[in-house]
């Protein structure tokens, strides 16, 4: 073994450990979860509310593609999802926005006026989109 080989090996190990550190520390994940919570049995109004909520979330295509917004319909009758009733103090179908940073919930808000607007699709969409925008504005700014 030449005198240079131990230093080359040490340098290689240092580079590998630095690269592993970079790979292990991804940029902070920040996004808004748009939830529509429902039961198994649903009326036409509940089905409309889910469709309108999904449509409102879909209007944020750039944010969705960037992973900054997610839509999920959740059946509260499913055993694995029952905890949401307690988490968000739910009594019936609801639209809830959850702002998440680094895999932790930073804040959430129930949109109680969704029920008042569900009979008027354009007002429902405007209401939900405005509330989603407010949550997106609160996310940490992306690094350039």
Regions found by a protein language model. Name each.
Residues 82-91:
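Charged, often glycine-rich, active-site loop that binds/positions anionic groups
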Residues 28-59:
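Local sequence-structure signature of Cys/Sec-based thiol-disulfide redox active-site neighborhoods
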Residues 57-67:
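Signal peptide-proximal N-terminal region
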Residues 65-80:
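Thiol-based oxidoreductase modules, predominantly thioredoxin-like and allied folds used
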Residues 1-11:
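Bacterial N-terminal signal peptides that target proteins for export
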């Amino acid at each position: 073994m030449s005198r240079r080989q131990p230093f080359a090996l040490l340098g290689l190990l240092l580079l590998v450990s630095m690269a592993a550190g970079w790979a292990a520390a991804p940029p902070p994940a920040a996004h808004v979860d748009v939830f529509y919570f429902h039961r198994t049995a649903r009326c036409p109004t509940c089905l409309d509310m889910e469709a309108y909520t999904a449509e409102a979330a879909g209007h944020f295509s750039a944010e969705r593609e960037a992973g900054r917004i997610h839509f999920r319909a959740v059946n509260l009758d499913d055993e694995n999802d029952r905890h949401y009733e307690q988490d968000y103090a739910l009594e019936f179908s609801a639209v809830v926005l959850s702002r998440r940073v680094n895999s932790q919930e930073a804040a959430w808000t129930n949109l109680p006026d969704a029920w008042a607007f569900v009979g008027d699709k354009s007002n429902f969409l405007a209401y939900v989109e405005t509330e989603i925008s407010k949550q997106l504005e609160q996310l940490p700014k992306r690094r350039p």
